[in-house]
Amino acid sequence: MWIQVRTMDGRDTRRIDSLSKLTKVDDLRDRIQQLFGVALESQRLFYRGKQMENGHTLFDYSVGLNDIVQLLVRQIPDSFPTKHKECELSDASAGCGSGQRDSDSGSGEGAMDVDGQSISIIGENVGTSLYKKNDLVDARDLNMGAWFEAQIVNVSKKVGPYGTLPEVSDTSVTSDAIIYHVKYEDYPENGVVQLTCKDVRLRARTTLPWHEIKVGQVVMVNYNPDEPKERGYWYDAEILRKHESKKIKEIYAKVLLGDAGDSLNDCRIRFVNEIYKIEEPGSTYLNTESPQKRQNGPECKHCKDNPKRACRMCACCICGGKQDPEKQLLCDECDLAFHIYCLKPPLSVIPQDEDWYCPDCRNDASEVVLAGEKLKESKKKARMASANSSSQRDWGKGMACVGRSRECTIVPSNHYGPIPGVPVGTLWKFRVQVSESGVHRPHVAGIHGRSNDGSYSLVLAGGYEDDVDNGNEFTYTGSGGRDLSGNKRTAEQSCDQKLSNMNRALALNCSAPINDKEGSIAKDWRAGKPVRVVRNSKGRKHSKYAPEEGNRYDGIYKVVKYWPEKGKSGFLVWRYLLRRDDYEPAPWSKEGKERIKKLGLTMQYPDGYLETLASKEREKENKTEDEPIDSPSKGKRKRNSDNEQTAAKSIPKKMKVASYKLTLEQKTLIKQDVLNAKLWSEVMLFLKEGPKFVNKVEETFLCICCQEVVYEPVTTECHHNICKGCLDRSFKALVHSCPACRHDLGKNYPLNVNKPLQAILSQLFPGYESGR
């Protein structure tokens, strides 16, 4: 097993070989120290967001083959001299740095720092301040640009960090230097907000009649940018045009969204009888007795702020009651309210914690692994046979234990028949690669299937000594009858086999009624369910049809018959006769060998495997060169040039791959898919690369939501292909934009399926739509 270690900045990546699943993190740190030269105490290792700690193994962190572990070099702080620290302490005690405290203490009623500038609170009036303490004003919300009714609670002036405070009577203080501390009347939870003069003005109190509203006039109107037909908040607006008929009055205006210059053009104002005049600065101050309050849009769209109506959105989400607001808790994650007596279990008092989370959002603190902590015990791994075994054998070096690095999603796991893009004759070095391709999913088991459905694939490996393999037809012995307790992979036959589990699954593929006593023979064997067959090099000792190395996909077979009999071990076993039924030629035939050459099918290795072998060979060569020669040899030593020539000969030449051939119907469907013409022009360039064409189609037409080949594709106006089901779920969540580029599609966007694209994908990936 090997992994890659990459520095956090991504500049240096090294491969570490000869590892095991049971390798300790402590040992991994030693290997990293040898490669990177980073001290042990300076290493911080991360894998999938977890910090790896000593005492655990790679298996505990589920580190897979060729996975990347990130290395962060811990910076050790420099130690300051003791004299320097004593000097700092003595300076502080002697009054060094006390100028800031003096200035703070001499800043009147109090001082604070905002945006790097000092604000000194003076009191009720500051120089040329337009408004005084307790004045009723309109204050602008800096995020929305809307105006809300507020009251001034204090006034201050702003000076630089090193400036001196002018006198209160100094008239040179400009309005921009005045800070108003206001409190919104309807939103006391926001506290006191500091605003400048441009965001504060006198409370609007004059409604304009229809005849006084002029085109070009700037007034204050009620508008809802999200729902224009509903009541919203109060914005400044410039009148664009007005129209009056016998039944209706219409006003269109440009709504101004704040001081930044943003605006909404040609907006229809619904509430034409509630248009306010903007008060000029310097007008008569309002008294504390406010005029009639303006009406804003409801905070809750569900209950329209009706106090008598129960609502689980703006009130307690359990009972919906609006009583006892002082006994409600607001979840800091989902923002839903809860009565303390509605919780399970109920609370007697409001908790004093700064943050509170509801039962659905709260994380179990006992399951959270903090940085520097050991991993929690996994119940799943504790039940494994390896956890209870007393054997000291290192089982973690085998390729069957590394786990899949990818998974086949083109077709579901219960797919019958060939896998799209995997031709007959494909070779893999290890069984885990066969699992990743989807041809045979189990890593170790010989039969893949379900006892109530059938068998999807099987592997011919070592098998039984009395199995017969004739290539196009072979006998196969079922599974079971062996004691595989603990972590054993194989054992001698010790009891009779039963027609259950995988044996029954393989029997269901036979086109005959199931019979668990005598077996059955198919009248029409071709009508049975197809089984994908993979031959392993371990079967070479029994069969000449097995590959010399690795695993080979040999095509589709059908079960002709199955029957029970006593094997050489003396116990009852179930035997199956399978016969080849595939239009692709067998890989051992003359036609099959020519097809393999045309398609350029060669042995497939895991990522990093060849590099690992090369590094091991270099290590062996270095060791042999470093070994002292005890006695002179009569033979001549080979020159490096000879070694290089032999190495060059061992590298296979790149074969010319046969082009992928499309049928006439497929070419017609591609031409009909006009919306994806640009994508198809790029994909068609891969026709000359044979089987890679199918992989390119899969990569190009991948749904960005489900990360699988699009099913019932909807080609958007921005030329992205999304599954109809995925886009429909997005629309139900009120997200009406393209998932790929966020282009606004609108609420009423039609979800029309691209039928030519669906047809061509169904032909290139037969069976991929099952289970979607």
UniProtKB/Swiss-Prot annotation:
A zinc finger (RING-type) spans 703-742. Its EC number is 2.3.2.27. It comes from the Eukaryota. The keyword Transcription regulation applies. Residues 212-281 are annotated as: Tudor-like 2. PANTHER family: E3 UBIQUITIN-PROTEIN LIGASE UHRF-RELATED, E3 UBIQUITIN-PROTEIN LIGASE UHRF1. This is E3 ubiquitin-protein ligase UHRF1. It comes from Xenopus laevis (African clawed frog). The lineage of its organism: Eukaryota, Metazoa, Chordata, Craniata, Vertebrata. The gene is uhrf1.
